[in-house]
Amino acid sequence: MINRGPKPLEVLKLVHRLGASCVLGNHERSFLKHLKKGSQSSDSFSKLKEEMGDHMPFWEEWLQSLPLFVSEGEETEPDSFLVVHAGLAPGISPQDTDPHILTNLRTWDPIDQRPGDENHPAWYTFYQKSRTIIFGHWAAGGVVMRPNAIGLDSGCVYGGSLTALSWPDRSLYQFPAQSIYYPPQ
């Protein structure tokens, strides 16, 4: 919601007004750290803080209230799912996982049992449970459709598409970006 488009405050207001369920992502965590430290490390964060004005404490509290993951159904039920911003460490419950992993993970090093680099396989290749994990965060990985993992990041911010998932039929809907909001790296 934050730091990947031209109107982050409007996005926050829309999500809040709709009462939408969402999870905390890496940019929201970074923004909260920015607020806590009072640093000036990010022009976009400083600008957003300024736009929030007197309502900044409200938005800070609301962002802090967002969960790191949302689950529906029991883990063994066929249509159960868990939504997380980035990924899960294989073999570790989300409740016991470092928030940095939940909001930043892309690849996994199976030897050292830790987040990997770009040469390691995607984390979801090691995920063996039946509950479907729905995630984003990795535009370069594109849309992923596996029996137990669905990746929805299709690079909208980079001029790709915005991808939505209908559950439980697993239908995908894509809408082309209206612009390139953030240049690809």
Predicted regions and their residues:
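Active-site metal-binding loops of divalent metal-dependent hydrolases
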Residues: M1, A20, H27-E28, A86-L88, ...
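Short glycine- and Lys/Arg-enriched binding-loop motifs that mark or flank ligand-binding interfaces
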Residues: M1, S21, H34, V83, ...
